[in-house]
Amino acid sequence: MAVITKIDTFAAIGAGVIGSGWVARALANGLDVLAWDPAEGAEMQLRANVENAWPALERAGLAPGASPARLHFVPTIEACVADADFVQESAPEREALKLELHERISRAAKPDAIIASSTSGLLPTDFYARAHRPERCIVGHPFNPVYLLPLVEVLGGERTAPDTVDAALGIYRALGMRPLRVRKEVPGFIADRLLEALWREALHLVDEGVATTGEIDDAIRFGAGIRWSFMGTFLTYTLAGGEAGMRHFMQQFGPALELPWTKLVAPKLTDALIDRVVEGTAEQQGPRSIKALERYRDECITEVIAAIAAVKARHGMRYED
């Protein structure tokens, strides 16, 4: 089917942490943005989130004409999507809610507008079941902060047209993102399945008194996390195999997978475990506010991305290589 491949107006359904991240990214790319959220105080919170993100976006580089003034908060779903070229829904992860929302969104949107959901694990075939023209409906799952992290996982449902996925990949690239096409419709997609495994193991380590939340974060940020930011998991292990590469690594360390060290099944979230996690992270946060931590995080992300891009350029590589 024919869908829009170049956008001027971006619609955001839902203006929470993820939705406001999409709004900030779209504004930074010089688009007009329409937003809707039924929550009380949503517009004020959305504008505050954009304001907090804007310094990092300025450091990263704004498109010509980019301005928070191009954000328009509207009272209904229909007013939000009627003139939009691209719709990004970021509502809570409840299938029944998304079914209802996408029935309304798809009937009010332009027939050639692409409709995307930020869902982190629900399957598009299921929640687009009542959508009008489901062939133009996809998942575009981002990562927080959406306005800085480039990864977005893209996939369609059983009735999504392949041309729609291709067009969405191009639009996300135009927004400065690194789209990753998910080959199969599976719960959790790719990145969140990996992150969930790590999160479960981290909770086990806290629950068993092996480490505090701060010590676990240190194990990541001073170790594997640094390598992951530019090399990922498989290429890192390729180097661990020495000159013989991955085959040697698999032969040498593969048998250790049978031990196993990991628990895999999530621990029971008892009150005691929740208290340990909350108290540990509160100690890590210290006197800093969430907004202050967000600004610190954003500056670190922009500097890390810039540094990696500069080193890759010296080696004849693009940032996304």
From Swiss-Prot:
Location of the protein in the cell: Cytoplasm
Indicate the principal place this protein occupies in or around the cell: cytoplasm
Gene Ontology cellular-component annotations: cytoplasm
Q: Where is the signal peptide?
A: none
Q: Which GO terms describe its molecular function?
A: carnitine 3-dehydrogenase activity; NAD+ binding
Q: Where does NAD(+) bind?
A: G14, A15, G16, V17, I18, G19
Among its keywords, does the record have DNA-binding?
Answer: no
| Lineage top rank: taxon | Bacteria
Cite the Pfam families for this sequence. 3HCDH, 3HCDH_N
Catalysed transformations (reactions): carnitine + NAD(+) = 3-dehydrocarnitine + NADH + H(+)
Q: In which pathway does it act?
A: Amine and polyamine metabolism; carnitine metabolism
Tell me the InterPro entries matching this sequence: 3-OHacyl-CoA_DH_NAD-bd, 3HC_DH_C, 6-PGluconate_DH-like_C_sf, 6PGD_dom2, L-carnitine_dehydrogenase, NAD(P)-bd_dom_sf
The record's EC number reads 1.1.1.108
A biological process (GO) annotation for this entry?
catabolic process
Keyword entries, A-Z: Cytoplasm, NAD, Oxidoreductase
Q: Which HAMAP family match?
A: L_carnitine_dehydrog (MF_02129)
Similarity comment: Belongs to the 3-hydroxyacyl-CoA dehydrogenase family. L-carnitine dehydrogenase subfamily.
What's its job?
A: Catalyzes the NAD(+)-dependent oxidation of L-carnitine to 3-dehydrocarnitine.
Assembly, per entry: Homodimer.
Descriptive protein name:
L-carnitine dehydrogenase
Q: Which organism is it from?
A: Burkholderia pseudomallei (strain K96243)
